[in-house]
Amino acid sequence: MANEVQVQLSPLKGGHPPAVKAGGKRISKKQEIGILERHTKKTGLEKTSATANVAKIQTMDALNDTLEKLSHKFPAVAHMAHQKPRPALEKVTPLKRIYIIQQPRKC
C-alpha cells in the first residue's frame, strides 16, 4: 500500500484546460463556466440599470431644454457651433511631380 501512488485526474493542467486536437492543430477549449455565467440573468442589476437609464434620459432632456432656450436668445452662437472653423489663410499645395521609373518587364 505504501507503493501505491494516488493520481488525481483534474480537468485543469497547468492552471488551464487541456488543448484539443482538431484537424492536426491544437486548439484550446473554451471554459464552459464563463458561458454559463453569461447566460444567467441577475434581476437586481436590470432594475438598477433601468432606473439609471431613466435618470440619464431626464438629465439629457433638461440639458436640451436649456440649450434650446439659449439658442433662441443667441441664434448666431448655435449656428456657429455646427460649422467647421475656416482657416484665415488658404493653404496652397504645390503640384506634385510624377516620377516615372523605367523598369524591365517581368517575363
From Swiss-Prot:
Detected in the corneal epithelium, and only in trace amounts in the liver, bladder, brain, heart, and stomach. Residues 1-26 are annotated as: Disordered. GO terms for biological process: apoptotic signaling pathway; cell differentiation; negative regulation of autophagy; negative regulation of CD8-positive, alpha-beta T cell activation; ribosome hibernation. InterPro entries: DAP1/DAPL1. Keywords: Apoptosis, Differentiation. GO terms for molecular function: ribosome binding; translation initiation factor binding; translation repressor activity. It holds the Pfam family DAP. May play a role in the early stages of epithelial differentiation or in apoptosis. PANTHER family: DEATH-ASSOCIATED PROTEIN 1, DEATH-ASSOCIATED PROTEIN-LIKE 1. This is Death-associated protein-like 1. It comes from Bos taurus. The lineage of its organism: Eukaryota, Metazoa, Chordata, Craniata, Vertebrata. The gene is DAPL1.
